[in-house]
């Protein structure tokens, strides 16, 4: 059975880029009757917070992603410690004592000599006495994994290719001689992402690892750890990264692109899902009504090789398609949270929904209709015309036909037509050049408010 995982770090709220990875894994599992695991990468106990764990779960529920299993790496430290000890005993995990500053200086020297900035394994030359002396000075080791890029002498590094058939990008190759031995354990004893991830993927029988292409080099190193632990390799797939329009990478600092903020702004879940999945693929970005329809247009092989750019204007446009199809019953609860309620609420929604991009935008039109303010938005020359319009406003209760009757009478009386006739009335009554049909707005505004706004 196919088994995939989504492994966010609960050190912040997930953004649209994380969402794309989650959806690719979720849809791949759905397409293949597989299992989807949510695994919190919470080994950083200081920065990981329960509020972010709760937030990630809320976001996934909103995206209609339902994990089959949920795991926390913070509950598996004893397992990681056991594997780490085994690797240390085999000489595959070795202690290093350089400070960040020392490593930085060494890197600059290598670059100045036009050498690749790869760690030279000098720590392997330390004797027991050297290590005792360094530790007596207060230094604590970080631990590196010894990459198998040599025959017998670890200081005689040779070209060593690690290749895999990437299920998204095709054959990928990494030369282990071009990368440093990865640090797996920090000076304080905490684990970096690499080792716990491999151990969990083995223990949880993950069959397919689908993640961003920024992990390609990391995959080459991780494959050697899988092999060192005599584990079966999963299939790897690396999808193009989602960036901003300017090409900047997304991060948890892009709070305006977090799923939490997009949800609170009133975007529809399916709009976010459609754009996340279809951006950067050969498929057209379209509004698919539900996840089943989206799944029919999902394929890892459709992913392009270039970066996918996320444009908020695309999301707004896509979102409007969903909003225009929403019935009053579907949005009633959300409208009530915006204080939009009462006997005219349904008529109001049906009137304005085709002219808004997000459900939250309804609050603006509710305010326009119910506010006591007047809109001083017409020219001085139009004020006489507005006074004439008051005199010709149809008697009795206003309905859908009142606008046509009113403007016909005004046209005959003033010889105005087209924009000169309609725009002055729209500006005076709504303060805006564009919006819902005026014939639908008149019954919502009511006679008294109309007269007040026309009498400047």
From Swiss-Prot:
Keywords: Aminoacyl-tRNA synthetase, ATP-binding, Cytoplasm, Ligase, Nucleotide-binding, Protein biosynthesis
A Gene Ontology biological process term: glutamyl-tRNA aminoacylation
Sequence motif: 'HIGH' region, positions: 8-18
Positions occupied by motif 'KMSKS' region: 249-253
UniProt-annotated binding residues for ATP: 252
Enzyme Commission code: 6.1.1.17
Domain of life: Bacteria
Record text on subunit structure and interactions: Monomer.
HAMAP family xrefs: Glu_tRNA_synth_type1
Name of the protein in its database record: Glutamate--tRNA ligase 2
Species assigned in the record: Bartonella bacilliformis (strain ATCC 35685 / KC583 / Herrer 020/F12,63)
Lineage, opening ranks: Bacteria, Pseudomonadati, Pseudomonadota, Alphaproteobacteria, Hyphomicrobiales
């Amino acid at each position: 059975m196919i088994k995939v995982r989504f492994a966010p770090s609960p050190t912040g709220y997930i953004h649209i880029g994380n969402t794309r990875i989650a959806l690719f894994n979720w849809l791949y599992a759905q397409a293949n009757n597989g299992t989807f695991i949510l695994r919190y990468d919470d080994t950083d106990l200081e920065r990981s917070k329960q509020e972010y764990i709760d937030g990630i779960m809320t976001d996934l529920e909103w995206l209609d992603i339902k994990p089959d299993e949920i795991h926390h790496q913070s509950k598996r430290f004893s397992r990681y410690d056991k594997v780490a000890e085994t690797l240390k005993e085999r000489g595959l995990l070795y202690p290093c004592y350089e400070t960040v500053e020392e490593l930085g200086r060494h890197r600059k020297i290598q670059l100045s000599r036009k050498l690749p900035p790869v760690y030279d394994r000098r720590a392997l030359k330390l004797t027991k006495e050297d290590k005792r002396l360094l530790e007596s000075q207060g230094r604590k080791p970080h631990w590196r994994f010894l990459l198998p890029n040599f025959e017998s002498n670890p200081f005689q590094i040779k070209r060593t290719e690690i290749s895999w058939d990437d299920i998204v990008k095709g054959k990928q190759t990494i030369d282990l001689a071009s990368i440093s031995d990865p640090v797996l354990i920090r000076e304080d004893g905490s684990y970096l992402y690499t080792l716990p991830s491999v151990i969990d993927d083995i223990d949880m029988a993950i069959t397919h690892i689908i993640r961003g292409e920024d992990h390609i080099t990391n995959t080459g190193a991780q494959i050697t750890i899988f092999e060192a632990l005599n584990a079966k390799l999963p299939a790897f797939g690396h999808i193009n990264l989602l960036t901003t329009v300017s090409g900047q990478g997304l991060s948890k600092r892009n709070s305006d692109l977090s799923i939490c903020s997009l949800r609170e702004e009133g975007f529809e879940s399916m709009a976010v899902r459609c754009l996340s999945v279809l951006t950067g693929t050969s498929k057209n970005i379209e509004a698919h009504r539900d996840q089943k329809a989206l799944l029919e247009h999902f394929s890892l092989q459709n992913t392009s090789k270039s970066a996918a750019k996320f444009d908020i204007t695309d999301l707004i446009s896509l979102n409007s398609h969903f909003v225009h199809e929403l019935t009053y019953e579907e949005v009633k609860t959300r409208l009530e949270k915006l204080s939009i309620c009462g006997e005219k609420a349904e008529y109001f929604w049906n009137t304005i929904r085709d002219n808004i991009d997000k459900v939250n935008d309804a609050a603006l039109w509710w305010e326009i209709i119910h506010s006591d303010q007047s809109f001083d938005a017409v020219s001085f020359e139009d004020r006489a015309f507005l006074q004439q319009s008051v005199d010709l406003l149809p008697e009795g209760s206003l309905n859908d036909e009142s606008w046509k009757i009113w403007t016909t009478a005004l046209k005959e009386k003033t010889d105005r037509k087209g924009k000169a006739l309609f725009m002055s009335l729209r500006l005076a009554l709504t303060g805006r050049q564009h919006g819902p049909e005026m014939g639908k707005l008149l019954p919502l505004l009511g006679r008294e408010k109309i007269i007040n706004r026309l009498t400047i």
